[in-house]
Design a protein with these regions (language model features):
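Short, ordered, surface-exposed loop/turn motifs in non-cytosolic proteins
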Residues: 59-61, 201-212
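Bacterial N-terminal signal peptides that target proteins for export
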Residues: 1-10
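N-terminal, post-signal-peptide region of Sec/Tat-exported proteins
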Residues: 47-83
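Beta-strand-rich domain onsets/edges
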Residues: 25-42, 130-192, 197-203, 215-218, ...
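Glycine-centered loop-to-beta-strand initiation motif
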Residues: 85-89, 223-241
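Short acidic/polar inter-strand loop motif in beta-rich domains
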Residues: 108-116, 251-257
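N-terminal signal peptide c-region/cleavage motif recognized by signal peptidases
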Residues: 18-19
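Short amphipathic beta-strand segments in non-cytosolic proteins
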Residues: 65, 69-74, 207-224
């Protein structure tokens, strides 16, 4: 679908002539390798588009947090090492001892304004059915919308041959997916439970989408599930490959300059 991106510093009159059009983007962290030796360097891509292709890079000023959880501590990544060349952002991590590392990137809020038609299409295509149904119920399908959005993405990397409990580290992002089990202790065909968090609290009945790619590059068909009363969603890891789990939590906002705020979360990992 199509979005109109609006810099907040512009006046209303200027907005009418300078609105830029861009595509909606999912966001994922995708290391060059998910299974990594100790004491090695790993290049990490931030995909801003789909799980297989980035369409736009993210500039440094949009970053709120870039960090990696190691077996000993959480280490901030110097944004001077952040590269935003072309359509893909990249950075590098340097592994030390064995364990399950957590990589995280959190972006600052941005704003969009959409026509009613574009907003409804966005809700339908990007997996936000509850807001679409609320607009239908309340007779608001014909209303345009202003939205504040921010995205918070993680990747799990297995360093060496000893999985650790660090996979469950909560980074404190506004939206976050936290595995209940370590994916690197599971095999293809297993199920994985994940907790959906918004502002640190479990989200009931959150719409969650998951999928991925096999080692050959074939798509793993996306599936959707709902979180339970404890905010936990259960996923069927049907095949070996690189997997993603994602959700978009959108809520109506009152007494603000926007109508809605959305908080995006994703996590990626590999299953063998």
């Amino acid at each position: 679908m199509r979005r109109r991106w609006i810099p907040s510093v512009l006046t209303s009159a200027l907005l009418l002539t300078t609105v830029a059009v861009a595509a909606a983007h999912d966001m994922f962290l995708k290391p060059s390798r998910f299974f990594v030796p100790e004491n090695s360097e790993v290049m990490v891509r931030l995909l801003n588009g789909t799980f297989t292709r980035s369409e736009n890079s993210i500039a440094r000023h949009r970053l709120k947090d870039v960090s990696v959880v190691t077996p000993t501590r959480r280490v901030p990544i110097d944004t001077a090492e952040w590269s935003a060349e072309g359509d893909t952002s990249t950075f590098h991590i340097h592994t030390r001892g064995a364990g399950t590392y957590v990589l995280g990137v959190s972006t600052r809020p941005s704003f969009i304004e959409l026509s009613a038609e574009d907003f409804n299409l966005y809700l339908r295509e990007d997996g936000i059915p509850d807001v679409l149904e609320a607009r239908r119920r309340d007779g608001e399908l014909g209303k345009p919308a202003r939205e504040r959005y921010h995205k918070h993405v993680k990747a799990l990397v297995q360093v060496g041959d000893r999985p650790s409990d660090h996979y469950a580290t909560v980074l404190g992002y506004p939206a976050e997916i936290v595995p209940i089990e370590n994916p690197y202790t599971l095999k293809s065909g297993a199920t994985l439970a994940v907790k959906t968090l918004v502002d640190g609290k479990p989200v009931v009945n959150q719409h969650v989408i998951y999928g991925g790619t096999t080692a050959s590059g074939a798509a793993i068909e996306a599936r959707d599930v709902r979180s339970d009363a404890q905010g936990i969603a259960t996923l069927a890891l049907s095949t070996a490959g690189t997997w993603y789990v994602k959700f978009i939590h959108m809520a109506r906002v009152q007494g603000d300059t926007v109508d809605y705020e959305s908080k995006w979360a994703s996590v990626t990992f590999e299953v063998r």
